[in-house]
């Protein structure tokens, strides 16, 4: 699939499903099932219910999508960092 055929939309995560899938309500009101992109999994970016995300969808199946960006909230408290100890 060529990159030009991808439809990008914004939405809000409603529910976290098993196997790293999410139920997302798009800005136009449709509800889809989406999964986190490989880069998000690689960098361990957490997606929680209520997060605003950008979703890529194929024009051939508009019920499934890939989350490729999680928007930061201005009023959201920063997440605590964990000090790592190496032996």
UniProtKB/Swiss-Prot annotation:
Gene Ontology CC annotation, any one: cytosol
Gene3D superfamilies from the UniProt entry: Nucleic acid-binding proteins
InterPro entries in UniProt: NA-bd_OB-fold, RNA-binding_domain_S1_IF1, S1_domain, TIF_IF1
MF terms in GO: ribosome binding; rRNA binding; translation initiation factor activity
Nucleus recorded as keyword: no
SMART domains noted in UniProt: S1
Main location: cytoplasm
Superkingdom of the source species: Bacteria
Domain S1-like, first and last residues per copy: 1-72
Cellular location(s): Cytoplasm
Record's keyword terms, sorted: Cytoplasm, Initiation factor, Protein biosynthesis, RNA-binding, rRNA-binding
Keyword Chaperone: no
Function: One of the essential components for the initiation of protein synthesis. Stabilizes the binding of IF-2 and IF-3 on the 30S subunit to which N-formylmethionyl-tRNA(fMet) subsequently binds. Helps modulate mRNA selection, yielding the 30S pre-initiation complex (PIC). Upon addition of the 50S ribosomal subunit IF-1, IF-2 and IF-3 are released leaving the mature 70S translation initiation complex.
Stored HAMAP family: IF_1 (MF_00075)
Family according to the record: Belongs to the IF-1 family.
Known partners and oligomeric status: Component of the 30S ribosomal translation pre-initiation complex which assembles on the 30S ribosome in the order IF-2 and IF-3, IF-1 and N-formylmethionyl-tRNA(fMet); mRNA recruitment can occur at any time during PIC assembly.
Protein name as annotated: Translation initiation factor IF-1 2
Lineage of source species: Bacteria, Pseudomonadati, Pseudomonadota, Betaproteobacteria, Nitrosomonadales
């Amino acid at each position: 699939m060529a990159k030009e055929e991808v439809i990008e939309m914004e939405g809000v995560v409603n529910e976290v499903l098993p196997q790293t899938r999410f139920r997302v309500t798009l800005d136009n009101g449709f509800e889809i099932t989406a999964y986190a992109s490989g880069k998000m999994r690689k960098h361990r970016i957490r997606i929680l219910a209520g997060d605003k995300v950008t979703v890529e969808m194929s024009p051939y199946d508009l019920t499934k999508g890939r989350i490729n960006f999680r928007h930061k909230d201005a009023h959201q408290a920063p997440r605590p960092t964990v000090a790592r100890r190496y032996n």
